[in-house]
Amino acid sequence: MSEMTIFWHDYETWGVDPRRDRAAQFAGIRTNLDLEAVGEPVMFYCKPTTDFLPHPDAVRITGITPQLTQQKGIIEAEFFGRIQEVFSVPGTCGAGYNSIRFDDEVTRFGFYRNFIDPYAREWQNGNNRWDILDLVRMTYALRPEGINWPTRQDDNDIEVASFRLEHLTEANGIEQAGAHDALVDVKATIDIARLIKKHQPKLYNYFFNLRIKSNVAPLLNTHVDLSERKVMLHISGMFPASQGCLSPILPLLVHPINKNEILCYDLRHDPSAMLAMSVDEIIDNLYKPRAERNENHQHIALKGIHINKSPAIAPISTLTDERAKHWSIDWQEIDTHRQKLVNDPTIIRKLEEMCSRKRESGECDADANLYGGFISNEDRKLCNQVLTSSPEKLSQWTPDFKSTRLQTLYPRYRARNWPETLSETEQQQWHAFCQARIVDGEYDCSLTADQFQQRLEELALEDLTEREQQSLNQLVNWVQGFL
């Protein structure tokens, strides 16, 4: 069995949507379990393509320009191929800061667009993934000693802890010159992990074990009757920082379709209103867009916990009386709310029916449709053939994919990576596609030309640094070169 290592990584991207925005830079450092570096750091850029516009805010923040990535980068197929290689080393735990919710999604969608299995590196050969953002939140909520906690003002003007990486490093004397450079952020993430491991080693090791879903599931005890289930603590960014990002929760139901999701109830909230609702009313309350909600909208404190996403779960015994008081937890009130749920004979049936109803989702372009279904074994074999074929062979071959998503992705894959192999007709089709996406906003466009221009005009009114202005000027020159 291979010795386990942690591959700490980070992306810089051209936007904030991992489904639709593209990667600009990737960096990573491999360590052993003692957080000592193993081997040399890796860092590379991805060449941009002409079917998307980099977001001006991304360029302003990172200072990475399309010209830089065009000059120093590699094509997207090679970019994600290299990333697959480092993640696929047996015994690798892929880790980062907010990586499960963002960076891992960038990886999955990048692999998918480039015919690489988007999930294999997460579980094959003893591999897994981890994310220390919730470790940081958990440390703050339960065992804050030994670490300096920076603060910020929340939306209600309340001073709360800030979990931004650059704020944590500054508060704890960790050098992070060049924040929003992928390699700098990776080094800072490792330093924060070392800090917690040093001051709260038991908590660090406990949370490290939660990267394995078979260690998480028993904590949520859904295998026993509802009346016997234990209240657990859950730490999540979905809970207010003013409450320590922490709430006591009661596990209710294993999602009947997605077995990795456990529906739980936040016991800070009285469940009476939810228990009185019909299934339709529960669905309406949960999924109605905020803009359509009226003053009669009743908050339903249901939360899905994904056992395969390294959730921060702990027994209530880990919360000292002092910390419980600090986070305004009234255990008598918590127990009253729990009893209401346990004593209701209909809630589990209602939730099962709610989960079984398939919600309609809008049209999704093939590039962003990774979660439109698993790839069949036959199509996966064809994907592997694509990966081992030369650009010249790809230009003379049209794989017989059963999946319409893959059929749509194939010509785009060739055009993005090897435009020189396109026929004249294919070049015209690619140009028309790019124009339709960027100018007309078709094909699930992330940022249209009009939106791009509007944001530039807004930024022109702000007090930009010389570096920011130079970066934006280069961005404009780049876009003018192909629009």
Give the residues covered by each predicted segment.
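Conserved RNase H-like, two-metal-ion catalytic cores of nucleic-acid enzymes
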Residues: 1-75, 85, 254-259, 263-298
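A general structural motif at alpha-helix termini
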Residues: 73-74, 111, 169, 211
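Acidic catalytic cores of enzymes that act on phosphate-bearing nucleotides/polynucleotides
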Residues: 209-292
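Non-catalytic terminal regions of proteins
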Residues: 270-483
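Metal-dependent phosphoesterase core characteristic of DEDDh/y 3'-5' exonuclease domains
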Residues: 21-26, 30-62, 85-201, 370-374, ...
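Charged, compositionally biased non-catalytic regions
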Residues: 182-229
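Generic hydrophobic alpha-helical segments
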Residues: 79-83
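Generic detection of long, well-ordered alpha-helical segments
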Residues: 73, 101, 183-186, 261, ...
